[in-house]
Amino acid sequence: DKKDLDLIKQTKIKAVNVLNENDFVKINGTWEAKRDGLMKILSSLPINYIWEIKERMIDHNIGYSEIVGVLTVKSGNIERRADGMGICSKIEFNEKVKFTLHNMNARAETRALKRAIETLFGSVINYFVMHNLGNK
């Protein structure tokens, strides 16, 4: 109804307003939202959210972790869900960033959560990029 549509609109406006240029990085010519910027969206808005791990595959022998999670966001009577999958393997680590099972799993889970946030708030992210970073 109209009240729900107004709530969605106001939430998106607030999300755009919490972002800044430092929340993005240009990778191969494309602006990508950083993890901290995406987490700001979740923590700065008047919404409730639940992050649940649905599947976890870890191969200790080859150093591979795959996480599938579901992000549920609630605002008023509106509830939205998005899946996110994150993968990390041992070959991504080096002398600077040491390989541990914790680091590998944490990186895979962060990637899964990031993808779910991008799915739910993609229009906000795209709007910010087009209006604030488009010519940079």
Segments predicted by a language model, with ranges:
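Polyanion-binding surfaces on beta-sheet-dominated domains and ring/shell assemblies
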Residues: D1-K136
